[in-house]
Amino acid sequence: MSEARRDSTSSLQRKKPPWLKLDIPAVVPPAAEEPSFLQPLRRQAFLRSVSMPAETARVPSPHHEPRRLALQRQTSITQTIRRGTADWFGVSKDSDSTQKWQRKSIRHCSQRYGKLKPQVIRELDLPSQDNVSLTSTETPPPLYVGPCQLGMQKIIDPLARGRAFRMADDTADGLSAPHTPVTPGAASLCSFSSSRSGFNRLPRRRKRESVAKMSFRAAAALVKGRSIRDGTLRRGQRRSFTPASFLEEDMVDFPDELDTSFFAREGVLHEELSTYPDEVFESPSEAALKDWEKAPDQADLTGGALDRSELERSHLMLPLERGWRKQKEGGTLAPQPKVRLRQEVVSAAGPRRGQRIAVPVRKLFAREKRPYGLGMVGRLTNRTYRKRIDSYVKRQIEDMDDHRPFFTYWLTFVHSLVTILAVCIYGIAPVGFSQHETVDSVLRKRGVYENVKYVQQENFWIGPSSEALIHLGAKFSPCMRQDPQVHNFILAAREREKHSACCVRNDRSGCVQTSKEECSSTLAVWVKWPVHPSAPDLAGNKRQFGSVCHQDPRVCDEPSSEDPHEWPEDITKWPICTKNSAGNHTNHPHMDCVITGRPCCIGTKGRCEITSREYCDFMKGYFHEEATLCSQVHCMDDVCGLLPFLNPEVPDQFYRLWLSLFLHAGILHCLVSVCFQMTVLRDLEKLAGWHRIAIIYLLSGVTGNLASAIFLPYRAEVGPAGSQFGILACLFVELFQSWQILARPWRAFFKLLAVVLFLFAFGLLPWIDNFAHISGFVSGLFLSFAFLPYISFGKFDLYRKRCQIIIFQAVFLGLLAGLVVLFYFYPVRCEWCEFLTCIPFTDKFCEKYELDAQLH
């Protein structure tokens, strides 16, 4: 048996190449005490070398003494609320959450407001500023290595970034050239624990790409005018998994055996992987071998270290040495070909099936983070950071993460759906900027045809009319409060109706309720009580007011006029009679005639007129077949629609302040809002989150509508004009908060100011409310200072932020309370205010907003 072992050993020695030398480090006896500063190693895969055979090594875990858990008091509800409120407003003492928000803010600022200062660019490590730095990471704590593995501790990552991999012979400028590894082909322990290592970001295994995602990618490529094949990265052979030369296992938790262990940015990783051939280390051709042997320069060949400047340009890690080539049967080892290898990067988790197909799709949907102050508007206005930014501010920018714009998507869906339904139900009004007139011959209440004219304001937004928008929920003061002018107008009309009577034609062909002046004395009889003998009695006396066509307290059964519920003397307070006892044979002229006119609510100011149905339909009014007097109907309830008033005499639809934010004047108006939301609003929501943006959006819109209802009470206004200008105010606040880190803040300010002034000038057109713009902008400015966290430039800024939150919240509440008082208790009548929101270039360019303008 021993002889067979000697034969086997000699056979192995004969097969061993002469150049192969095995240097196995001696095992150092375990020390009596393990170093306390070492970090325990959780996974044994980190101690396995790729260049050595994979053996099962047992690493003893460090001994931990059992510790008793410290008793802690449960946090009180007051402290929890206080801490949560501080975190929400961005004034928490938790440095992690504060730095995370501040880093995100600066990153957003770099995309929106232009170039940063030079010192910021040098110190800031953003994805858009890819500079190779060997001193960008901190030194990770060393891993705990068991006693049996102490002989393999010195494994140096040649190009690992950070102070953990610098030697004592660093140059004076703080940089040093990378050292070659002691064990070629081995994975460095520090590579796995470094913050720059790909092992800290192990991706989970994903499912194969769905048909829907591939269809969406193809549609996106066609929209961009590209071919579907151009949308993917070029590959050698199309396969759903990476060849075995990268990694042998399909799915690994941590790398046990790696050929290479150097990693770079994820973007470079996928880009490089997709361009490699199937086999990275292919055998060169004979002609290529001859050329390599003749090459005079051997510095850049296999095994040679790249120059530092070339490394910084490529941003890639050095590949490790190729393995030894198998000896030919001739007995001599074939010369190692000097092949310049591509700078490859292998993912720590290993390639997976479907990776080559998923890479272009991820690039298609990839979105860069929004640097604080440099969002979409910042890119349009060429904003940049300063050259120097404090490291504390820089960390705040880096820690910021983008939010998902849920509120923007929900708002866009609601706006689109409501606009489509409104146009489909109420139709489209005449398109234009002036007034549209319609003339036709219509049967009037006297029984003859007359030429009448209907005037309607044109809508250049391609949408419904003003009456339809009011019925849908537009901002309209007479529907939100008891307007003094409208109420006085209704009372005056009732006073005239109180002295009216039924005008009966002599041939009994018809009758209508009218005044004495409108009733012909030759062709008709004006049945006026108590002069006419048909006057009934009330408490022993003749009634002084009446008669009413087709209504008499003596013949009405429901509701009956019986003591103690007799109908009052004033006919404007009579109820609607739903059932008569005698029909048309009462021997009373005002009851036996054919009525030709009933109440019709015309216009948007509560005007009621007793007329024929044909005329009411032509004027697009609300005809009341059941009533005989205008006092028996409530026209404002018909005009406003929605929920009925609690008191028919007092409108109370205050919810129009926020309901109108979801309505639009037309299709074009909705498209403008959608474009604004998908650009500016979506960009800001990524910065602040949906809850903050929703608060600013809704409160700014409500404040803008409230101011518009005060100064333009008789104008129907829809759309989120105040909300959009409140969002524009957020851009100004973001600019002010990032003023210290921008290279040219004044230029960015004037560009943004020019955009806002242009939008204010655009508000001088009809159907656009500048009062909502101004009030929404001012309220949005206050709310942004209160609810938008920002970059902190020191401890003083933290206290300033707390004072800022309290002050601006108090100012906004004061502004809102003042507007509420003006609207409900001290109405303001401003005759020149309409010129601020619409300049009448012609007589018919602007709609007349005064009360008497629409009365025909």
From Swiss-Prot:
GO terms for cellular component: endoplasmic reticulum membrane; Golgi membrane. The modification Phosphothreonine is found at T180, T183. Glycans are attached at N584. The chain crosses the membrane at residues 413-433, 657-677, 693-713, 716-736, 748-768, 774-794, 805-825. One of its GO terms (molecular function) is growth factor binding. Keywords: Endoplasmic reticulum, Glycoprotein, Golgi apparatus, Growth factor binding, Membrane, Phosphoprotein, Protein transport, Transmembrane, Transmembrane helix, Transport. The keyword Transmembrane applies. One of its GO terms (biological process) is cell migration. It is a multi-pass membrane protein. It comes from the Eukaryota. It is found in: Endoplasmic reticulum membrane; Golgi apparatus membrane. It holds the Pfam family Rhomboid. Residues 434-656, 714-715, 769-773, 826-856 are lumenal. Residues 1-20 are annotated as: Disordered. Residues 1-412, 678-692, 737-747, 795-804 are cytoplasmic. The modification Phosphoserine is found at S76, S176, S391. Signal peptide: none annotated. PANTHER family: INACTIVE RHOMBOID PROTEIN, INACTIVE RHOMBOID PROTEIN 1. Belongs to the peptidase S54 family. Regulates ADAM17 protease, a sheddase of the epidermal growth factor (EGF) receptor ligands and TNF, thereby plays a role in sleep, cell survival, proliferation, migration and inflammation. Does not exhibit any protease activity on its own. This is Inactive rhomboid protein 1. It comes from Rattus norvegicus. The gene is Rhbdf1.
